[in-house]
Amino acid sequence: MHRRDLLKQLAAGFLALAPGLTPSTASAVSPASAATEPFDEAWLRRRARALAAGPYRKRNTALPPPLAALGWDAYQSIGARADHALWAGQSLPFDARFFHLGLFFKSPVRMHEVAGGQSRVIAYDPAMFDYGKSGLDHAALPADLGFAGFRLTTRADPTRDVAAFLGASYFRAVGGQWQYGMSARGLAIDTGLRRAEEFPDFTEFWLVRPAPEADTLRVYALLDAPSVAGAYRFDIRPGDTLVMDVQATLFVRKPIERLGIAPLTSMFLYGENDRTDRAGDRQSAARRWRASDWRPEIHDSDGLAIWRGSGEWIWRPLANPPALRSQRFADDGPRGFGLLQRDRNPDHYQDDGVFYEKRPSVWVEPAHGWGEGAVELVELSAADETFDNIVAFWRPAVAPQAGQELAFGYRLSWGAQPPVAPPLARVVATRTGIGGIVGQPRRHFSWRFVIDFAGGELGQPGRAAVEPVIRVSRGRVEIVSARPLANIDGVRAMFDLVPDAGNAPIELQLTLQSGDRPLSETWAYQWTPPADRAV
């Protein structure tokens, strides 16, 4: 499937992530079958290894006719019954509610409960759902229908989700602001290449019954795709920052050109850095949208943060490019990376319906050394906010070959702030616009970059002089300055870039320094010169 089609479907499907229905007075039913079999992580790895040793079998996507006939409103009216959730009425700290098949979610996902080292299939039961206004005759559905995915709630607040797994290998979670936003997924394959991307699927889940006072829920998953099979373990701990510890073991079926570990997916339509028509192709749909939308900014994330193995911190503001583009940040033993929503000011969004200022940031922390590779950022052109057009992931330096076994562990932190932050000054805003000196004739085209830094030593009295150190891959830099910015107790750095005749993206970096000593994280950017360079 093409990426744009799938992500449109997932964005629409995740709109269904609303609070669960109020529990009824009916007693909870057991959703599990009687037959059990032994289960542990080693068994799951053996299962994935055996799966990868055979040919890939394409999943069934033919919905039963009653489900295939459902439209958007009808499908959206089907909700999980809280009183028939897994572990409902058992005084346990978590329960799980299942998504019904239908609409965009056509391939059944098998669910299992694990207790005492034994697993049992969770059978589809129409009693688990309220069919609302769908008009669906559930008696006409097959008994082994299966599910589309699941969502997790807690005993502390059973009306609100803390995490959900739905569609391909996608999942989402919330932190203390109880707001869904960007997604993560199990694996990315050939993302950002100029051909159809491969989307692995979580085909089965095993939910481990929690102890009565547990603060963490363990979930296992089996992943399958034409190129790879995998065994996954998720340890999910809700809180102001929800933490997921992920362990993945992959078994490669065939060579993979671009493998993405710990992939994150988000949306960036426009921000203060990316509003101006001349920032790219002024005829693009995205530019027309931002010229007419009343909201100042629309994005789930506004930047990629990287903590390199060397200790350097990088901040790369996101953009909505005129065409597909990617940027790689080579590293050896990365300490972490994430897609963040740094801007938390509601006045900058003016949207009291979706609350972009509350969208969670997600930080990836490798559990063990990942060696050589690169953090890769892929940006696609988006015409509206329903399309997740941003992807970031870790790409190992050596492409996997058929027969290889790979293991990766990492922690995902979902919340308003990442668990770590640079001790230096941070970028708080990036703006761009036409260059030159106001009031003087422009003799050539140039583009201005304005970067605001705050924190670190910048607000301290008697600090040393600040020098902006700028590096560009092409073109010429002129009109450089760095001056105090009192309203943020920081520094504003500015420069103009005069591009050469080429149209390929230009990479830029800027760091504030005092002599050889860095005072700020490294601001990194990628800019595509416009075709129209009239002055």
Curated annotation (Swiss-Prot):
Keywords, comma-separated and alphabetical: Periplasm, Signal
Gene Ontology CC: outer membrane-bounded periplasmic space
InterPro entries to which the protein is assigned, alphabetical: Gal_mutarotase_sf_dom, GH-type_carb-bd, Glucan_biosyn_MdoD, Glucan_biosyn_MdoG/MdoD, Glucan_biosyn_MdoG_C, Ig-like_fold, Ig_E-set, TAT_signal
Pathway involvement of the protein, from the record: Glycan metabolism; osmoregulated periplasmic glucan (OPG) biosynthesis
PTM description: Predicted to be exported by the Tat system. The position of the signal peptide cleavage has not been experimentally proven.
GO annotation terms (biological process): beta-glucan biosynthetic process
Source taxon at top rank: Bacteria
GO molecular function, one term: carbohydrate binding
Location(s) in or outside the cell: Periplasm
Segment forming the signal sequence: 1-28
Renumbered residue ranges of the record's region Insert: 275-287
Listed Pfam families: MdoG
Segments forming a coiled coil: none
Protein family per UniProt: Belongs to the OpgD/OpgG family.
Summary of the function given for this chain in its UniProt record: Probably involved in the control of the structural glucose backbone of osmoregulated periplasmic glucans (OPGs).
HAMAP family, A to Z: MdoD_OpgD
Name by which UniProt lists this protein: Glucans biosynthesis protein D 1
